[in-house]
Amino acid sequence: MNILGINAYHGNASAAIVCDGKLIAAVEEERFNRVKYAAGFPALAIQYCLKAAGITLADIDHVAVPRDPYARMATKLLYALKMPSFARERAKVLVKFTGIPEALAAAFDSDPKNLKSQFHRVEHHQAHLASAFFVSPFEQAALLSADGLGDFASTMWGTGAGSQMKIDGAVAFPHSLGLYYSAVTQYLGFPKYGDEYKVMGLAAYGQPESLDVFRQIVRFDPNSRPNGFELGLDFFVHHRTGPEMSWADAGKTPTVGKLFSDEMARRLGQARLPEAPLEQRHKNLSASLQARLEEV
């Protein structure tokens, strides 16, 4: 049995091929088009995977994508009413995901009607959990997925045992540890997609002097909020405008619009411009950001 995994229309677009239970290849599109964090459809990565496996498109039995457009539909519809522009952008992504069979056929100059594969849409965070647990050496494990946003959730947790996963809870948009980290990264003068690692490294050179404020930015009390955390939304704008993101073009690095509000500057001081020098204050804020993340 040949299974093709496709991560498309998201940062780090990639593909993987599993043949008879063995991972043959897994690679990101950026390795071929030389675009950092390339999004779009990973046609070159898919071509490489099939070549490495010595098979053709006709030999693929199953295709899995880490996105379920129908997950949390009620929440999506609610935000569509509140944020029409955001809804239109997400609708464009939905159209692309439903067109993956056509994009796959086009990558091989084939007719979509010739595809014999069965397509599977896997909820975003369940795909994260599965990709970690099912290749681990553990028979049982606690599972956690936390990122910016996927299928309108930012965090999911549960347990794994044998070949099964049990989902115990999730945190829905707009509350997100990933968007929290990205927002403060932007505030500290690092606006590009994927810049968070710079701030994580910077944290080692500072002291968490603003931890009290960061505990208001991300609120977590296991006694009063047993099902997760909450963002202090006054510090953010994504819940009002939707996170502006570009994922469609494989020839470009993804972009993310502004996430933090004026309240963050009011409470923490003026936001740093990208060209401004790094001061000890910025290092201390980075340390506070990281410390609060680790607390939660």
Which residue stretches match the model-derived regions?
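Short acidic/glycine-rich loops and adjacent helix/strand connectors
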Residues: 1-296
